[in-house]
Amino acid sequence: MILHGFHLSTSSHCLPFIFRHLFIFHSITALCDHVISNYCNSLKLSNNKFNQMLSKFVVVEVSNSNNTMTLVEYLVTHGFDKFAVVTDLVDHPSFKYKDGSSSPESPSTTASTAAQHTPPRTAVSTPTSINTPVPPHQNKQRHSIDKIAANLSTKKVSPSSIEKQLQRTSHNPLHQLSTPHALSQLQKLLEEQHKINQMNIQKKEQERQQAEIQRILLQQANAAQINHSFGLERLTPEYDDNHHSETISKASSEDLKTEPDSTDFGLGTSDDQVRASMLHLLHPVFAPAFGMLDAENIFGAASKPTTPASKRRNTDSNGAPSKKHRWLPVNELEESRSSRGKNCGRVHCKATYKCALCGKPTTLNSTGSRWNLLRHVIMIHSDCKPYKCWDCDFTGIKSNVISHARQCRHNAEDAHDITTDEMRAEWNLRLHECFPDYVRAKERGWQPEEVTVKKEEVEESPTLVKQELTLVKQEPTFAEQLEPMAQPLV
């Protein structure tokens, strides 16, 4: 019998010492510990020599006594790594490895019986040199390995020992988890799996946040595009508030050409009917405020040296820079008309009108195309709002109603127009109350006030008075001619 569980090397003179203790000790655990300790003490081996002997093995042939069978049972049931029962020493795998054949597999912890090819020896052990076998002792009784196996099979074994043996020999997960190394590996695997789950959760959260950011960006881009289409960018004044100083505008000729059309203050191009109705209610001289008529053509003011449309297109197509437009105060407008040359740009009057109720200033040009800024102030002081939300009672201008609908998740496709004739009449009254200077400037065709100069001229020359009186009489007749033109628009 080969006891690989001890991992010790011995010679033939040590075997009687070992078997002498087999019949003294009745405790199996004490027997194993005492055999190993006494064996090491008797040989007086150093640590280095003992480490070299760990790769050797012990070969013992035992009898079928009770103590021997108990020792074999203990070795089998308590999990020694390398333990086997062979019929002869020649059948040991180490001899096959020594002869140069393939390396043997490590024997399992079971008692296997093989056919008896040769008669077994009574006591055989491996010396330091395997090529010199040791003769057996003749005093010991010979016992075959078959009897040992039969005694092991017929001997009553406690249920606990059988369960331990099955747990040791079976390849189930519980057996693998019984060792600390397996538990540590399992713990590492669980930790890695937990980390992977956490990483997956974080990745999903990042993807969700990125999708939310993209959705918000797209929503803002769409809102900006819609606001641009409704003319919300025109809420802010495009001109400098310092109306008393001469400034240079960066607007191109195309901006000036499209400037009279941008008068809806967020109402969109589809609100021509509202603009025409307000034109009908107001005096015809206010028509240029809605971008419908030209004030200079109406009142016969001095024509401005503007370039024709064909020449303007040619200059734009050739890539030449368009002429800059100078903005002058009202008092300097007439002087600039007489003194400027052909190469100068278009000159416009830039004046600021303050609300008579709240004092809010509003800057406009000579064409009156920014009248929507005045309308914004009028809407503040008026209780009548032109548009209403489809889903609630919120009222206001079109841009405010659409913004409210988007914030409240209401129908934001278009605002509900609730304009009536009473509202238009009230807005007309509010215009005269808030901006009387604007009304007077429109009535005189954006000409500067020359009341004192006219009085002096009346005293000096009566002919000039007659001419001025004829001009004053022509103004209402010309306005009456414009009324049929404004009525079809309604």
From Swiss-Prot:
Biased composition (Low complexity): 101-120
Keyword Amino-acid biosynthesis (UniProt): no
Compositionally biased intervals (Polar residues): 123-132, 151-176
Domain of life: Eukaryota
GO cellular component, one term: nucleus
Key words of the record: DNA-binding, Metal-binding, Nucleus, Repeat, Transcription, Transcription regulation, Zinc, Zinc-finger
Chief localisation class: nucleus
Region described as Disordered: spans on this chain: 96-176, 236-262, 302-326
Skewed-composition ranges (Basic and acidic residues): 236-260
Region (PEST): 101-110
Changes seen on gene knockout: RNAi-mediated knockdown results in embryonic lethality. This is rescued by RNAi-mediated knockdown of rsd-6, and nrde-2. RNAi-mediated knockdown at the larval L1 stage causes a weak but significant decrease in expression of lin-39. Knockdown in mothers caused lower levels of lin-39 expression in the P blastomere of embryos. Knockdown in L1 stage larvae, in a lin-39 mutant background, causes abnormal fusion of vulval precursor cells at larval stage L2.
ZnF (C2H2-type) ranges: 353-381
Tissue/organ expression: Expressed in somatic gonads and germline precursors until the 50-cell stage. After the 100-cell stage, expression is seen in differentiating hypodermal and support cells (at protein level).
Signal peptide feature range: none
Entry's Gene Ontology molecular function annotations: DNA-binding transcription factor activity; RNA polymerase II transcription regulatory region sequence-specific DNA binding; zinc ion binding
Described function: Probable transcription factor. Required to specify the fates of hypodermal and neuron-associated support cells. Functions during vulval development, playing a role in vulval precursor cell fate specification. Positively modulates expression of homeobox protein lin-39, perhaps by binding to regulatory regions of the lin-39 gene, acting in the vulval lineage.
The protein's name: Transcription factor lin-26
Protein's organism: Caenorhabditis elegans
